Each structure stands twice: as structure tokens, then as C-alpha cells.
């Protein structure tokens, strides 16, 4: 009997304002940020905003038609881009703030190690520190 995918670390998905969040903590933070935006303390609140860390890599190769004549150069993607998807991004006093909601932090886990690399790339590429909530 198929029961679907088990949530990681036992968290339960929560829906607020028709938006499904991965955890109660993330949904609660959304409600807090929404209140701050309504009060005018933050602006331009975005959910799941993507930041490109490493662009896609392409290989250029000459293309030939059936007659053997060279056509315009073609491009083939050999590596997809690497992106970081922030839980929340907003502006406070004109400065971009990026937040990632973390429940249980296990430094030994592969998922957290991947996050640490993306956090460092965000600082290097975009000059933005990620706040862990």
C-alpha cells in the first residue's frame, strides 16, 4: 500500500493563505513577516525566491545540414545551473534580507553540508548573508 513520501525529520506540511509550507516553523515565520510587511517595517516579501549561484555551462559545436553545409553554431547544455531557493526574501531599510528556516541542524548530514556550501556561495556571488531562523 502506497502512503506517499515520508516527511524529512518528521515535520508536517502546513497550509496558510493557500500556501503550503514544509513545517509549522516556516508557516509561523511567514505570518510574522506578513504582519511586519503590513506594518510597513519590511517590503517586497517574496517566498521561494531563486538566486543563481553558478550559471549553466554550454558547449558550442558546429551544426551541419543534410547537404553538408555548415549551419549556425549550436549549443548544448553540459551542466545545469546551480540555484539557491530562499524560504523568504524581503527588503528592510533598503537592504535585501534572505532567510532560511531550519528546524533541526545536523552538521553531519549531507543536506546541511549542501546548505553550507550554498550559503557561502550566496555571500561570495551576491554579497548576501543568509539568516538561519
Regions found by a protein language model. Give the residues of each.
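Electrostatic, structured charged patches in enzyme active sites and in nucleic-acid/phosphate-binding
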Residues: 1-133
